[in-house]
């Protein structure tokens, strides 16, 4: 009888682990923290704001394209358009972000900024989750390339 009870209990536990998430659960294709992590880098590393240092057009690496409500984070990003009409020098001004990689300490994000032809820098930024928000500790972004 004990063996049967133990077998039934372990079967129920294993079955619960194998149950897929409910349809209204979080999406599996991305992380709901991505927008907040990117916004933290934009505000704290690049010092973008809505008044005197407005963000450059934003672009993402590869097929990564999170849908974010940037105004929620006090930012006003416009999407990068390489075919934008007008001054061609404006088409080489952008900030880009790769998909955040999460670990036990927070997230790491590859990011870069181009201010114009041959005037850009790449970084790898460590972002940590604080009590109220994601933050970029002082010195947590290291240069990865310069043009």
Task: Describe the predicted segments one by one.
Residues 1-17:
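Sec-dependent bacterial lipoprotein signal peptides
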Residues 5-8, 86-91, 125:
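Residue-level signal for the start and early helices of compact helical domains
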Residues 17-121, 140-147:
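Flexible low-complexity loop/turn motifs enriched in small/helix-breaking residues
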Residues 124-133:
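Short beta-strand segments and strand-loop junctions that repeat across beta-rich extracellular domains
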């Amino acid at each position: 009888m004990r063996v049967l009870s133990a077998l039934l209990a372990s079967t129920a536990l294993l079955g619960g682990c194998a149950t897929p998430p409910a349809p209204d659960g979080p999406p599996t294709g991305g992380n709901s923290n991505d927008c907040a992590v990117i916004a933290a880098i934009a505000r704290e590393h690049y010092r973008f704001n809505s008044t005197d240092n407005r963000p450059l057009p934003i672009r993402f690496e590869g097929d990564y394209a999170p849908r974010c409500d940037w105004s929620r984070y006090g930012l006003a990003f416009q999407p990068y358009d390489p075919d934008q009409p007008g001054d061609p020098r404006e088409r080489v001004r952008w900030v880009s972000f790769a998909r955040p990689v999460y670990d036990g300490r927070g997230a790491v994000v590859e990011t870069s900024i181009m201010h114009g032809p041959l005037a850009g820098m790449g970084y790898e930024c460590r972002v940590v989750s604080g009590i109220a928000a994601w933050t970029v500790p002082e010195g947590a972004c290291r240069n990865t390339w310069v043009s």
